[in-house]
From Swiss-Prot:
GO terms for biological process: translation. Belongs to the bacterial ribosomal protein bS20 family. Binds directly to 16S ribosomal RNA. The keyword Metal-binding does not apply. The keyword rRNA-binding applies. GO terms for molecular function: small ribosomal subunit rRNA binding; structural constituent of ribosome. This is Small ribosomal subunit protein bS20. GO terms for cellular component: cytosol; small ribosomal subunit. Disulfide bonds: none annotated. Keywords: Ribonucleoprotein, Ribosomal protein, RNA-binding, rRNA-binding. Pfam families: Ribosomal_S20p. The gene is rpsT. It comes from Clavibacter michiganensis subsp. michiganensis (strain NCPPB 382). Residues 1-22 are annotated as: Disordered.
Amino acid sequence: MANIKSQIKRIGTNKKAQERNKAVKSELKTAIRSVKTAITAGDKDAAVKAVSLAGKKLDKAASKGVIHKNQAANRKGAIAKQVAKIG
């Protein structure tokens, strides 16, 4: 356990940030999962809507520093590519 006052405060803020980041990452996984389920079902309209929502969440997570902007771009590109394959 930390003895320095600033470090005790830092432990608390780190814990809050960790919980917030965990929640955001969970939302991202859910959004990407919904895209993949729409793709496997072959429903292009639902997949396009899900990609839009997932892209928005990925961009927001990247802007908040939860994930790196390149990782967000890679994930957006990958799911968009999969949706484009749907006939």
